[in-house]
């Protein structure tokens, strides 16, 4: 898979007065180089329509679109991949359905899950939540930057840090060994989405982390 550094996940509850397309396009223009549609509440047809909108956007800017959990929607819009949680469809089954050419990401909260995901053939893993977060319901306790250090030392596939990452603490995340960061509310809930992403992009560039 193509490498990435700044990952944005949808969260429409954080921008009720702005369209999904407008917010995500601003994020891309600010430096986001991979996007994920995450929608646990809408009816399937609505999720499909959102996926079509985002797929058109992803193609326009030549970046990957990942669909969270909805493997049928991912197939329907020919998304670049899917992202699965620990309680979602098993990685081995998802790979049979998606094929070898699609991206499969797995959320992990401890090193044993990271090892299992790598062994099972995941293309990347999510590492988190690093800090407390209100963007996801039923979220596990923060894993802290210590987990980033573990993964950076032991896991060879790409990993992305997620969970409560903000401008005031992102340096801690990078200091721990992360080279890819992912956010929901800090990006899509920002007053200036493009400007916020540009700041994160600059921080990454100053660290020598290219897109």
UniProtKB/Swiss-Prot annotation:
GO terms for biological process: thiamine biosynthetic process; thiamine diphosphate biosynthetic process. Its EC number is 2.5.1.3. Transmembrane segments: none annotated. Mg(2+) binds at residues 69, 88. GO terms for cellular component: cytoplasm. 2-[(2R,5Z)-2-carboxy-4-methylthiazol-5(2H)-ylidene]ethyl phosphate binds at residues 133-135, 164, 184-185. 4-amino-2-methyl-5-(diphosphooxymethyl)pyrimidine binds at residues 36-40, 68, 107, 136. It is an enzyme of class 2 (transferase). The keyword Acetylation does not apply. Pathway: Cofactor biosynthesis; thiamine diphosphate biosynthesis; thiamine phosphate from 4-amino-2-methyl-5-diphosphomethylpyrimidine and 4-methyl-5-(2-phosphoethyl)-thiazole: step 1/1. Binds 1 Mg(2+) ion per subunit. One of its GO terms (molecular function) is magnesium ion binding. It catalyses: 2-[(2R,5Z)-2-carboxy-4-methylthiazol-5(2H)-ylidene]ethyl phosphate + 4-amino-2-methyl-5-(diphosphooxymethyl)pyrimidine + 2 H(+) = thiamine phosphate + CO2 + diphosphate; 2-(2-carboxy-4-methylthiazol-5-yl)ethyl phosphate + 4-amino-2-methyl-5-(diphosphooxymethyl)pyrimidine + 2 H(+) = thiamine phosphate + CO2 + diphosphate; 4-methyl-5-(2-phosphooxyethyl)-thiazole + 4-amino-2-methyl-5-(diphosphooxymethyl)pyrimidine + H(+) = thiamine phosphate + diphosphate. Belongs to the thiamine-phosphate synthase family. Condenses 4-methyl-5-(beta-hydroxyethyl)thiazole monophosphate (THZ-P) and 2-methyl-4-amino-5-hydroxymethyl pyrimidine pyrophosphate (HMP-PP) to form thiamine monophosphate (TMP). This is Thiamine-phosphate synthase. It comes from Halalkalibacterium halodurans (strain ATCC BAA-125 / DSM 18197 / FERM 7344 / JCM 9153 / C-125) (Bacillus halodurans). The lineage of its organism: Bacteria, Bacillati, Bacillota, Bacilli, Bacillales.
